[in-house]
């Protein structure tokens, strides 16, 4: 079977082929790609990025599409995609996500080439709904402010929200036309049907990064009273809520620390201050208000292996997002058996059953979040029981072989 994939970024195997360097870890899309190639599928991958077209072997070829702002539709892409469809003659077209403008361009191209009934899109994030929760818990005056960086980029919090709304409009147009969609939670199922009641919804869980299928959290080896969050990059991750909750955690556990990936949002150098966004400025204000500056650990950009170690080092993993579908970060924490606390948003309850596998709290309730972190700290070794139950569940949800079988079944149904 011939598959035409549309990806938001280049899979690792393609980056490796272009650079001539070995792959540094296997990400989730590579996991799926390699499985399909082993099963005899021929796959052409189109991805956002740069580089010349290439051929890895008889099972896989690739080409880049230009990176333009996600929220601005590029009509010229339609003709490029039509040419790809005519040249490759795929049995199935698969767009990994509908949250970028190129997904709509592929939908329109498939329709023009008579291939729309043989196209499917996987739901990843849904910008239309993310936009509704983008500013949750952030004061209005903070949302309206602009740092120099925001002013130059036209990218303060409200402007970021507007871009999500625009992406949501393109996403909605794509879903309204599509005949088939792949999802994995009750939440994305409801969202898809609310946009297009007649769409055929296919269930398929996600496979995660390969390295997270090995390793096991151990209370004796973790950093006691430490919390790990996977991102503070933008408001939807809800790190402002976590800072407020963590201030209460520190009252009970003065030695507590909070680690997060990425660079510090509290720059000390002049250039860093010039690059600071209004959301980062707000996080800095909260950190200083609650005197948390010395409690925060910024881990920078992490490889998959280093990210895994950050989970294993933590006493507790926290997902404080204002909205998620099926967050990979929570899935990775569960696969490793890390005791976790998660906001009750989107499809979280499809991933983790509370309280037997971890604790779930109402999004925005910083008191409940703090209490649940404190509770897990106090459980000490006993928290391993929750982590083990979560691990068992995640091994079923993220079973690579089962998920590959489900995906191949979907492809057979719509070819």
Say what each PLM segment does.
Residues 1-52, 60, 114:
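N-terminal subdomain of nucleotide-sugar transferases
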Residues 4, 218-237, 243-248, 258-261:
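Conserved donor-binding/catalytic core segment of Leloir-type glycosyltransferases
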Residues 31, 127, 143-180, 190, ...:
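Membrane-proximal helix-turn-helix segments that form the acceptor-binding/catalytic region
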Residues 85, 309-314:
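Short alpha-helical donor nucleotide-sugar binding micro-motif in glycosyltransferases
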Residues 272-301:
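Nucleotide-activated donor-binding/catalytic signature segment of Leloir-type glycosyltransferases, i.e.
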Residues 322:
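Aromatic "clamp/platform" in nucleotide-sugar-dependent glycosyltransferases that forms part
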Residues 339-342:
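Short hydrophobic beta-strand element within catalytic cores of glycosyltransferases
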Residues 354-355, 359-366, 375-380:
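Conserved acidic donor-binding segment of nucleotide-sugar-dependent glycosyltransferases
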């Amino acid at each position: 079977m011939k598959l035409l994939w549309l990806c938001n970024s280049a899979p690792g195997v393609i980056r490796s082929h272009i650079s001539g360097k070995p792959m540094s870890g296997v990400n989730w899309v590579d996991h799926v790609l390699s499985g399909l190639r082993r099963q005899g599928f021929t796959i052409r991958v189109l991805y956002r990025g740069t580089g010349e077209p290439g051929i890895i072997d008889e099972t896989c070829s690739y080409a880049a599409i230009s990176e333009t702002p996600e929220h601005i539709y590029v009509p010229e892409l339609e003709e490029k995609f039509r040419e790809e469809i005519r040249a490759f003659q795929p049995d199935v077209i698969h767009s990994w996500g509908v949250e970028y403008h190129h997904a709509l361009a592929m939908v329109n191209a498939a329709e023009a080439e008579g291939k729309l009934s043989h196209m499917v899109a996987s739901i990843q994030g849904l910008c239309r709904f993310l936009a509704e929760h983008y500013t949750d818990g952030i004061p209005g005056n903070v949302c309206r402010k602009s740092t120099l960086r925001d002013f130059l980029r036209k990218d303060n919090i409200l402007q970021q929200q507007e871009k999500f709304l625009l992406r949501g409009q393109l996403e909605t147009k794509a879903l309204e036309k599509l005949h088939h969609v792949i999802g994995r939670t009750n939440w994305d199922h409801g969202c898809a049907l609310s946009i297009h009641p007649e769409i055929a919804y296919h269930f398929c869980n996600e496979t995660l990064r390969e390295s997270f299928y090995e390793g096991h959290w151990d209370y004796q080896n973790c950093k006691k009273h430490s919390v790990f969050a996977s991102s503070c990059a933008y408001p939807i991750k809800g790190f402002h809520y976590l800072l407020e909750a963590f201030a209460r955690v520190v009252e009970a556990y003065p030695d507590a620390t909070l680690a997060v990936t990425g660079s510090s949002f509290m720059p000390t150098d002049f250039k860093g201050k010039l690059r600071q966004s209004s959301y980062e400025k707000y996080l800095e204000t909260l950190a200083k208000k609650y005197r948390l500056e010395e409690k925060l650990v910024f881990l920078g950009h992490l490889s998959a292996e280093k990210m895994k170690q950050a989970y294993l080092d933590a006493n507790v993993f926290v997902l404080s997002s204002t909205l998620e579908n099926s967050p990979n970060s929570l899935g990775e924490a569960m696969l490793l058996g890390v005791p976790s606390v998660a906001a009750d948003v989107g499809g979280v309850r499809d991933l983790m059953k509370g309280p037997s596998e971890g604790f779930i709290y109402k999004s925005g309730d910083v008191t409940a979040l703090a209490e649940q972190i404190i509770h897990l700290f106090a459980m000490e070794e006993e928290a391993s029981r929750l982590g083990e139950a979560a691990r068992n569940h995640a091994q079923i949800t993220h079973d690579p072989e089962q998920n590959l079988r489900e995906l191949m079944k979907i492809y057979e149904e719509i070819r």
